[in-house]
A protein has these predicted regions:
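Structural motif
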Residues: 17, 76-78, 135
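Short, flexible loop segments at the rims of nucleotide/cofactor-binding pockets, characterized by
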Residues: 49-53, 78, 152
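Residue-level detector of anion-binding/catalytic polar loops
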Residues: 7, 72, 151
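Asp-based, Mg2+/Mn2+-dependent phosphohydrolase catalytic module
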Residues: 2, 12, 64, 80-81, ...
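N-terminal helical cap/lid subdomain that shapes the substrate entry/recognition surface
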Residues: 1-61, 67-69, 85
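Short, surface-exposed loop/turn motifs that are enriched in glycine and acidic residues
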Residues: 49, 73, 106-110
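Structured helix-beta-strand junction loops
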Residues: 69-70, 168
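Residue-level marker of alpha-helix boundaries and capping positions
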Residues: 13, 53, 75, 132-133
Length: 187
């Protein structure tokens, strides 16, 4: 932001404001200079992102329970596809997702559009619908899942009663992956 003449955001501001993919958010933020801003951002991001990647508590246990049951697992993210796949490899999670890691710019449109969901299900014979769990931690995730008619699950401390979820409330809400894991264990 600073390199592009904007004031820096605090971590809290960043967490609140960053929802859309870069290709959708940067033109709004930086206008005609968005590609320059993208190059600056990715230059800085590449230097540190794999060093800071950490597993979310309970996430690996949950996907480790679901996959052997025959559940199709995929990730739909507004993080760039290359970065998403590099993180999966670093975490040792490629075995769970069998190539179904869909990041920003992999599909024609990014979340909240449904294109990435269809891409994540391509070749599986599975159609989006209420039997498909779409789990996320932001309104963009829930809006995407609801638009595809999936069962939406909000995980984290975002308040599902807040204004950002008024047009697309989640079907379920859990404060942590560990809480959702307890539900998965009972399946």
């Amino acid at each position: 932001l600073v390199a592009m003449g904007h004031e820096a955001w605090t971590l809290e501001e960043t967490t609140t404001r960053v929802r859309k993919s870069l290709r959708e958010a940067f033109p709004e933020l930086f206008g005609d200079r968005w590609e320059e801003a993208r190059d600056i951002f990715y230059g800085a991001y590449r230097e540190v992102h794999l060093e800071r990647v950490e597993k979310i508590d309970g996430a690996e246990d949950m996907i480790g329970l679901l996959q052997p049951q025959g559940s199709h697992l995929g990730v739909v993210s507004n993080k760039s596809g290359g970065h998403l796949r590099a993180e999966s490899t670093k975490l040792g999670w490629d075995r769970f997702f069998a190539g179904y890691l869909i990041g920003a710019t992999d599909a024609p449109n990014d979340k909240p559009a449904t294109d990435p969901i269809y891409m994540a299900l391509e070749g599986t014979g599975i159609d989006p619908g209420p039997d498909i769990w779409f789990i996320g931690d932001t309104w963009v995730d829930i809006a995407c899942g609801r638009a595809a008619k999936c069962h939406t699950i909000l995980v984290g401390d975002n308040d599902p009663e807040s204004a950002e979820f008024s047009d697309h409330p989640p079907d379920e809400h859990y404060l942590s992956c560990r809480d959702l894991l307890e539900v998965v264990r009972r399946l």
